């Protein structure tokens, strides 16, 4: 099995586990065990080293700590793809990059349309711009060979650029008041990591030691701690067939797929439908997120792909029809983990009462987009 096959198989399993974890969280959130679920996520955990102590509830250890490892993996995958993967050929960059940009712009505009007159609500404009690569590839994989491999590659490339956009959005728009001392320490640790690469250090343990120090500095700086994972990834050496980057990526992938993302989904997807009424479904935040994911994503991605002459040649070469492209555009509306994550950042310092609305919008929008995308692909794709 080559690396591509292994990657897609893992993402398939990851998508299934995410679905199970999310459904389990929703079931518990609507059962008598809801109180225990909330209590479990609110348990404080502390880590102390000398005079330094960090205390956070379990939910934030997952969102700030474990998700930094997920972003480290994203960074490693992006670096690998740029160095020697689907993004290494610059002619392959334009279509997925501009498509991802359009797939970001349309959902954001829909969200802004519904929430323009609510300054606090408006802070969630980026929630429907995300695409969950594990969920989307998991859905596509259920159709097996019906979906051309080139479409899976295109979907992956769009999702990678989507992740890059999410990283930029978090850094620019969801950063708290900054601590110059902590930022300075973060810069020092970043320079040390760059130096380790430059002087040919190839011990993962040394990189991870300074990586943890960088994460703590970023956590204390006001910049979201998950971005430390991206910075660490960019400093990891990628030389030779069995490079340090490859070894670290392979080592992390299973942990992320089998533990971190399912745990994140379980901790964040617990939507309670008790007392749900039409007024909640028509809340501006719910409409902005749900319609942004379902309508915004499909409009942005399908219209932009249909525009490129270069892409039309690609369609003919691989016998891909526009209906299949439309199915892929729909599936890109499955924002799930990334949308929930951005939602937790958007309102954490303003109005936590909006989080149930975020969860309802993300769950409904992602479910409808994923289901309709699956049905469109199933009806328009022949077995190969």
From Swiss-Prot:
<feature type="transmembrane region" description="Helical">
    <location>
        <begin position="204"/>
        <end position="224"/>
    </location>
</feature>
<feature type="transmembrane region" description="Helical">
    <location>
        <begin position="124"/>
        <end position="144"/>
    </location>
</feature>
<feature type="transmembrane region" description="Helical">
    <location>
        <begin position="153"/>
        <end position="173"/>
    </location>
</feature>
<feature type="transmembrane region" description="Helical">
    <location>
        <begin position="357"/>
        <end position="377"/>
    </location>
</feature>
<protein>
    <recommendedName>
        <fullName>Na(+)/H(+) antiporter NhaA</fullName>
    </recommendedName>
</protein>
<keyword id="KW-0915">Sodium</keyword>
<keyword id="KW-0812">Transmembrane</keyword>
<dbReference type="Pfam" id="PF06965">
    <property type="entry name" value="Na_H_antiport_1"/>
</dbReference>
<keyword id="KW-0406">Ion transport</keyword>
<keyword id="KW-0813">Transport</keyword>
<comment type="function">
    <text>Na(+)/H(+) antiporter that extrudes sodium in exchange for external protons.</text>
</comment>
<dbReference type="InterPro" id="IPR004670">
    <property type="entry name" value="NhaA"/>
</dbReference>
<keyword id="KW-1003">Cell membrane</keyword>
<feature type="transmembrane region" description="Helical">
    <location>
        <begin position="325"/>
        <end position="345"/>
    </location>
</feature>
<feature type="transmembrane region" description="Helical">
    <location>
        <begin position="285"/>
        <end position="305"/>
    </location>
</feature>
<comment type="similarity">
    <text>Belongs to the NhaA Na(+)/H(+) (TC 2.A.33) antiporter family.</text>
</comment>
<feature type="transmembrane region" description="Helical">
    <location>
        <begin position="179"/>
        <end position="199"/>
    </location>
</feature>
<keyword id="KW-1133">Transmembrane helix</keyword>
<keyword id="KW-0050">Antiport</keyword>
<dbReference type="GO" id="GO:0015385">
    <property type="term" value="F:sodium:proton antiporter activity"/>
</dbReference>
<keyword id="KW-0472">Membrane</keyword>
<feature type="transmembrane region" description="Helical">
    <location>
        <begin position="94"/>
        <end position="114"/>
    </location>
</feature>
<dbReference type="GO" id="GO:0005886">
    <property type="term" value="C:plasma membrane"/>
</dbReference>
<keyword id="KW-0997">Cell inner membrane</keyword>
<dbReference type="InterPro" id="IPR023171">
    <property type="entry name" value="Na/H_antiporter_dom_sf"/>
</dbReference>
<feature type="transmembrane region" description="Helical">
    <location>
        <begin position="256"/>
        <end position="276"/>
    </location>
</feature>
<feature type="transmembrane region" description="Helical">
    <location>
        <begin position="9"/>
        <end position="29"/>
    </location>
</feature>
<dbReference type="GO" id="GO:0006885">
    <property type="term" value="P:regulation of pH"/>
</dbReference>
<feature type="transmembrane region" description="Helical">
    <location>
        <begin position="58"/>
        <end position="78"/>
    </location>
</feature>
<keyword id="KW-0739">Sodium transport</keyword>
């Amino acid at each position: 099995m080559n690396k591509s096959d292994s990657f897609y198989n893992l993402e398939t399993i990851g998508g299934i586990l995410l679905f199970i974890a999310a459904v389990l969280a929703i079931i518990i959130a609507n059962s008598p065990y809801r109180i225990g679920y909330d209590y479990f996520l609110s348990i404080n955990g502390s880590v102390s080293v000398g005079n330094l102590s960090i205390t956070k509830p379990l939910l934030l250890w997952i969102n700030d700590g474990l998700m930094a490892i997920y972003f480290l993996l994203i960074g490693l995958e992006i670096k690998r793809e740029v160095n020697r993967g689907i993004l290494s050929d610059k002619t392959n960059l334009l279509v997925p990059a501009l498509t991802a940009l359009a797939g970001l712009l349309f959902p954001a505009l829909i969200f802004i349309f519904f929430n323009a007159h609510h300054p606090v609500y408006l802070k969630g404009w980026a929630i429907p711009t995300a695409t969950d690569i594990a969920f989307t590839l998991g859905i596509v994989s259920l159709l097996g060979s019906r979906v051309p491999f080139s479409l899976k590659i295109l979907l992956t490339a769009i999702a990678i650029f989507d992740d890059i956009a999410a990283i930029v959005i978090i850094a620019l728009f969801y950063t708290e008041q900054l601590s110059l001392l902590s930022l300075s320490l973060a810069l020092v640790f970043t320079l040390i990591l760059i130096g380790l690469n430059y002087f040919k250090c190839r011990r993962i343990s040394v990189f991870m030691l300074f990586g943890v120090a960088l994460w703590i500095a970023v956590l204390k700086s006001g910049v979201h701690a998950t971005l430390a994972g991206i910075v660490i990834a960019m400093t990891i050496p990628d030389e030779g067939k069995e490079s340090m980057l490859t070894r670290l990526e392979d080592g992390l992938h299973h942990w992320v797929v089998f533990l971190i993302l399912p745990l994140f989904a379980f901790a964040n997807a617990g939507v309670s439908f008790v007392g749900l009424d039409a007024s909640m479904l028509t809340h501006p935040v719910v409409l902005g997120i749900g319609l942004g994911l379902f309508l915004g994503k499909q409009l942005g991605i399908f219209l932009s792909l249909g525009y490129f002459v270069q892409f039309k040649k690609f369609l003919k070469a691989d016998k891909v029809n526009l209906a299949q492209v439309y199915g892929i555009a729909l599936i890109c509306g499955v924002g799930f983990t990334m949308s929930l994550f951005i939602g937790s950042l958007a309102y954490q310092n303003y109005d936590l009462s909006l989080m149930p609305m975020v969860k309802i919008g993300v769950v409904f929008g992602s479910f409808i987009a994923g289901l309709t995308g699956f049905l469109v692909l199933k009806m328009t794709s022949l077995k190969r």
